[in-house]
Every structure is written in structure tokens, then in C-alpha cells.
Amino acid sequence: MAEKSYVFNDTETTGLNTWFSQIIQIGSVLTDNEFNVEEELNLNSKVLPWVVPTKGAYETHKQTKNLNEGMSHFDMMHFLKNKWLGWGKTKELVHVTYNGMKFDEELFRRQFYWNLIDPYLTTNVNGSSRVDLMVIICLLYTSDAA
């Protein structure tokens, strides 16, 4: 069995609706199985011309430079794909998010698909898997975990 490594992911987006929002910033941190940081990644892309950002998103993350600066969304998603595939060549990756199953993972799938990339990259490649810390915390600290 291959050694496991963890990839902690977070996104900043143009809104909360996963059908219409765009990822404009992705942060990923690769750690070994003892959570020692091996590599960090911070990617930004310009907002696509047909995406209408919500005011609330920009009030939250303050990423206004992405309106005019950064790489193209296509380039960002392909760079991310290549980086994650590189990290996973010799290790089984566990992608870790907070509320990722309902938000970040949905955005990754849609936007990988938009850019002609396998939408199941975080679960279908070299034994990769994922975990949502929000689900674990809800199970540990609430009596009515959903």
C-alpha cells in the first residue's frame, strides 16, 4: 500500500451557488502522514467574462485583484490538475476540506469539467480519497449531526 499524504484545500469564489460561481483562488497544502508541510500552492485566476460575482463574496474574501489580474481560469485549473497528479504519483492523497463535500468538491468537479479535466480527480486517481472536516466536527460535537 502506498504511503498516504494529505492535501488541505480551500477556495475563494465569486459566490455561494455552485452552479454559477467560479473559483478565483485555490490554496492547497501537501503534508506527509505526520502532517509535516511538504509543499504549498496558492493560485489565482481572473474572473471569467460571463460570471457575475456576488457582492457578499467580495466583502468576505476581499480578492478584488482577481477582477483584472491573475492567470486564466483554464490555466489555473490545469496547473492545479498537474500539481495534484504530481503529488499523487507515489502517494495516496487524502484531500481534506471544511464543508468541501457540499461546496469545494462540487466546484472542483464542475470547473474541472468546464476545462476538459476529469471531474473526479480527487477520488478516482491512484487511490485518492477525500474527507470533510465539517462532517467530522458535527459528528463529534453535536447531538443531531446531519
Q: How would you describe each model-predicted region?
A:
Residues 141-146:
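Conserved small/polar residues in nucleotide/adenosyl-binding loops
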Residues 2-112:
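Conserved non-catalytic scaffold segment of RNase H-like nuclease domains
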Residues 124-140:
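Histidine/lysine/aspartate-rich catalytic loop segments that bind and position anionic ligands
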Residues 104-128:
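Substrate-recognition/cap helix-loop segment adjacent to the acidic, metal-dependent catalytic center
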